[in-house]
Amino acid sequence: MQPSRPVRPSAKAVVIHQQRLLALQLQDQDGVFYILPGGGQHAGELLPDALTREVLEETGLHVTCGDVLFVIEGAHGEPFHRVDIVFAAHLQGASTGEMLHPDTNQTGVAWLDVASLNSLPLYPSRLRRAIMRYAAGTAGPAYLGNECIGDPPCTD
């Protein structure tokens, strides 16, 4: 059993427009990678409100929050136990055209081809196939388990 760490709920957005997935582009010493927009829930804040706030801050885009699609955890390797609740989200209106509060290491915003997600560095990697199934209208598991370092890449 791991030492006690605080649990941090996080709301993440799956925004698909013209078969492309909205993602944050980040860069570290290992190169460029992508994550879903969204972030931590503040005390007293509802998850849909956290999602719309975070997406606006990170991308400059206004979205509405839809249904919960997936839950994935990050219980290892961080100072807290992250629980990501991943929602469908839909673009609304015009964008501000700027990242208001980009994430650490964020270099931009990208629209990734959904059909190619299995070969792109989108993390957590367990989301790749799940998002592809969702975009195709195919059901799959909602609970994706714990994100693990070294999760095998999806390459099929």
For every predicted segment, state its role.
Residues 1-22, 71:
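Conserved N-terminal beta-strand and adjoining loop/helix that marks the start
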Residues 13, 68, 87-89:
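A structural signal for short, well-ordered beta-strand segments
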Residues 5-7, 32, 79-83:
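Residue-level preference for beta-strand/loop junctions
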